């Protein structure tokens, strides 16, 4: 039998800093709770415990604080955004029937140790889940520790057993106490022995076994140099630190493993909490949809939509004629389009839903769909793009979509993350979801048409109230069929060239490995950070730049600083670049080439908070461009024989948008002049004539130009362009002095965000930024950068979307096809004889997509590959 216990404070703290800030519509922060539950469920699935509980700290001082006034004295107070989540977290655990333990005067660590001991005495195994390495001292044959790490929004765990601990530290787990006694622990303000670091402490314990062993052998003969004096002077501090670092296993708690057996949650209580916290995904994950109906007898139960309308199974096209009368239809379809249900909008209760089955209608099915999806038949759907793409695959050319509930919901809350129809119906219409698994498919689709009908009215009203109806009708909705057609068409890839490129990369990778192993004198795992760190900093003796808790850091920043110190470092950087190119592009793209030689990506139009499109399965928006070798990937994307690719992109669109939004006359004049804007900026910032601007000045000005859009700090700018912070500050100050409109915009937009809680693009797209009122400086600063950037980046995204719609329709009548959108760039495939006309059409439509105070400029080229056209 196995029990898993969570170090509640440690795990929720990791979750808080590992998950981006999330808030409910009422302003309650929820990211720590959400992250905690995700970590909990992931680890439950890994460990598969029979029993489960959580230990928390209390606010009262512990015996360690009484023993040493400085214990944890350097810790910052808990951020208010996390503190407000703690009581709610405990409510959630109570609703999940997960016991919570805390003991006044004792820390959660001591509860963990005590639970581990009691489990072992009862013949149980115990798994401790924590983000604190202190607990590693508890590891033995029956107690394991799963150490939680969060970085860059990602969470991972390491499982420590005695063997794993010995392999990492070269010591027994219990000796972690002795290690901390010698080296101290800054996070808990445990002093240790002054001047003794981790390496020295570890070496001492490997020689003498324990802290007692170290002091039993304390002599100038055994401890060279100043080490003897450090240990002699630090003896009292070492033993105090030993006491503070020791986790007690005798906390007075009422505990038996059997009292913590996993039980089903209190479904209704958990459902209510998750609804309040707006955890729709977790409601689905825990299967709580039906819990909405589990109410007290005294309450009037909420009624789900049940699909109780009349279902008419269409046998012939004639029976579907009422659908073609011009009334707006709500349509839901099976993923494979084997069945489709269409219901005319009706205010009364006696609604008829028409069921169209492919197997029933046979050869009449596709022609009926073609008529149903004609432009003169208005339709509302949920998430139209996959439906449109499926119709295109059947040979149907769809039109007439007048409302898309998923896209509307995305505009109303772009940070929501998920736009499943049942969730939207519950949130906006207060309709509990039906148990779809127990219903026939036609009833499920009928229910969905009813939800679409209701949401069309509700979401449409909210779009009008928030001034986003024009954005919806002129940009987002017309874009859906454009994206569907682009996904349907795909782009041709030279599979043989891609294979040959991969073979060439393999040869270069082998050469890098041989070079590195030659310097090492042995082979090792180049993908292991630990082994690579040993090679760089021990075998080669290079100076460590940065250390992490798990050892030496070997990230790109570290390698860049070491590049000139040994040729092996450049070889490692080359190895990483080459393996990335091979695995992600050379190999990855080959796997997704279709039978017709084309790759078809999926454009995500309801994902990003700024309104930009993203590309997945595969991502064709991140094809490398910064290195010549990476750019070679673009050579593999080619037109069909006798055709060319036309590539058109905007010139400095975000800076032009900034000039418009900030209404900065000097910046606008620079763009209207047609001069090189970065050179003009350099002239302004450095106070030299335009003809005297050097390439270095231009490069620095370019970094400031683009950095300002993202709220760059003097520290970041200094790092980017290799100057001192003082110089970087002078550049920024000079820039904002010359472009005073930009400076005013940077101030005003942050104040607007604080006042309204959101910012807008030129076209009215909103992004909520509740974090801008955070008491946490880092969180608030990040929110301010979002406030600065979103109107600029979001407006640029709106413009490129408008351009896509314009280009798509302007190309009608030609054979040319719009294939890809990559940020500010459009790629079109066309016959060679259409190329000049297409280039003119595309640039014209892009340049006239929006009327700004400065001209939009687009440039187009053609070529026999994406590389050649760029």
Regions found by a protein language model. Give the residues of each.
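Conserved catalytic core of nucleic-acid polymerases
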Residues: 488, 596, 600-601, 605-608, ...
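Charged catalytic and DNA/RNA-contacting regions of genome-maintenance
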Residues: 127-129, 136-174, 339, 343-344, ...
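Active-site palm subdomain of RNA-directed nucleic acid polymerases
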Residues: 463-475, 479, 799, 803-826
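Extended two-metal-dependent nuclease catalytic cores across DNA- and RNA-processing enzymes
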Residues: 23-24, 73-250
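Conserved RNase H-like, two-metal-ion catalytic cores of nucleic-acid enzymes
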Residues: 3-4, 8, 14-53, 69-70, ...
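Function-dense linear segments that define catalytic or interfacial modules
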Residues: 341-347, 412-435, 444-446, 451, ...
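Conserved "right-hand" nucleotidyltransferase catalytic core of DNA-directed polymerases
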Residues: 234-360, 366, 373, 378-379, ...
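C-terminal polymerase-core module
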Residues: 507-514, 518-570, 737-785, 789, ...
